[in-house]
C-alpha cells in the first residue's frame, strides 16, 4: 500500500472534542500527538469517521464541548 492510499484510508483531526467522540463511538485511534501547540489525532476508516464527525456537530456532545470551552474562558 502506497503512502497516498494510506492517507485516503485515515481520518485526521486537530479537534479534541471530535477525537473524543470518535473514540466513544468505537473508532480506532492510530496516532495522537502534539506539535507546535497543535493536536493531531489520526483514526482508521476515513469514511466512518467523516460520517461520525458530522454526527458530532449535530449532537449534545458538541454542545457539551462548547460549554466546557466557555467555562474555561470565563476563568482565564
Residues of each region from the PLM?
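C-terminal basic regulatory modules in eukaryotic proteins
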Residues: 2-7, 16, 52-76
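N-terminal acidic leader/helix
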Residues: 4-31
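Aromatic side chains
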Residues: 11, 21, 41-43, 56, ...
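A short, structured beta-strand/loop element
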Residues: 24-49
